[in-house]
């Protein structure tokens, strides 16, 4: 048993270091939905060079979102002009309607020939987080290519998806492709600071037009390589849900005074005690209440003894595994709502008892809980009427999108993954513990999938929102190929025969 416990922590601690965790089924490989007439995803050398050069140019435009109130609007406007020049066929095709939404976001409507087919949507975001130059091997907005990699902020988050989607469409249109199924491309400009000015406005526009999507695909999970010890195979993970959020301000007001005659408790002391209680009293462990437990059982066959035995018998080892998951910050976030103190403000002068103390708490809500439940738990833990709670922002965890053999979006992603990446045998759904723009579209589809068709290893992952963000030229070209194939697969998709219980 000691050896078994020693093996598990290392495995569990890195189960998902990229903001997602797995759940679901691996399913058999199937290509029966493919049509006989397809445009092969074979690009000329000139086209392959153009693919990488277009991404380099996109990275060079610093479309930074600094805060909800501040973004580089000059760069956002420049980016709009850039994509017009980079993809002339897209912008001049009679099949494509382009609209600028909320000044800097973009909505493309690609008209299909069969109006009976429900449309879908491909998503990405134009904005990036700030990138101070310190520590970078190259300037963060240079888009330089070194040793087969393109460097720069947005190379993985999320200029790569913006450009890959548009480039795939450009290449299809150049080859006179006419889609059967209509689809949309939505490019938000403020995802890094909530998406309320971009994606939310696009969603409202589509809702006003009565659009209902079969599914959407946004950023999220990757094809993981080297993240899970003892598992040599790459694992493609498609996030089918994501955590909710609750931002709270805790505030204590007291009568100010001179520090020479202090009261028994100050506003700082009262608030500090409340915050300490929150840190020392974590939210309930929800392991078993979400898809993670099911996934571990599924992945059991991929591991050797003793891990496979544990994962096949969670009915017995549930308490051990759930406790192990708590030991690492990443895996802890997979099994519970997290509570993080992010700001603390108090004090005006060294000899003055402060009249006001404020702290800001960020909660990321597990899919098995609600905003109301978490708020009540916070109140019960603080347990002090002198501490006022103010909700600054909140939204519920997103519903879990279907991932069975009846789920069109999931099945199309799985089929395309296995076609473009034949080395990938394992495709599973997951939970995104970060937030994306998908939540703004929950009213127009129940199929929301988050997947970046790129292999990712721990070293490359460290560049996301960090230093030396980069993408392999070959991997990026394969991302374009993936979308090129995906659009065609969506046209040839055959609705599955309903299960007997659905008839």
UniProtKB/Swiss-Prot annotation:
Glycan-modified residues: 72, 443
The miscellaneous remark of the record is: Overexpression in mice blunts high fat diet-induced increase in fat mass and associated weight gain. Free NAAs represent the biologically active form of these circulating molecules, and the circulating NAAs bioactivity is determined by plasma protein binding.
Q: Which gene encodes it?
A: Pm20d1
What functional role does this protein have?
Secreted enzyme that regulates the endogenous N-fatty acyl amino acid (NAAs) tissue and circulating levels by functioning as a bidirectional NAA synthase/hydrolase. It condenses free fatty acids and free amino acids to generate NAAs and bidirectionally catalyzes the reverse hydrolysis reaction. Some of these NAAs stimulate oxidative metabolism via mitochondrial uncoupling, increasing energy expenditure in a UPC1-independent manner. Thereby, this secreted protein may indirectly regulate whole body energy expenditure.
| Subcellular location(s) of the protein | Secreted
Which residues does the entry assign to the active site, renumbered to this chain? Answer: 127, 191 (proton acceptor)
Q: Which organism is it from?
A: Mus musculus
* Alphabetical UniProt keywords: Glycoprotein, Hydrolase, Lipid metabolism, Lyase, Metal-binding, Protease, Secreted, Signal, Zinc
Q: What happens when the gene is disrupted?
A: Genetic ablation causes tissue-specific bidirectional dysregulation of several N-acyl amino acids. Locomotor activity and resting energy requirements (RER) are slightly increased and decreased, respectively, in PM20D1-KO mice on chow diet, while diet-induced obesity conditions produce a marked impairment in glucose homeostasis and insulin sensitivity in these mice. They also exhibit enhanced defense of body temperature in cold, and antinociceptive behaviors selectively in response to chemical and inflammatory pain stimuli while maintaining normal thermal pain sensation and normal movement.
Coiled-coil region(s) at which residues?
Answer: none
Q: Which residues bind Zn(2+) 2?
A: 125, 157, 218
The effect of residue 127 to A is: Loss of N-fatty-acyl-amino acid synthase/hydrolase activity
Indicate what this protein is called per its UniProt record: N-fatty-acyl-amino acid synthase/hydrolase PM20D1
Induction data = Up-regulated in adipose tissue upon cold exposure.
Q: Which pathway, metabolic or otherwise, does it act in?
A: Amino-acid metabolism; Energy metabolism; electron transfer; Lipid metabolism; fatty acid metabolism
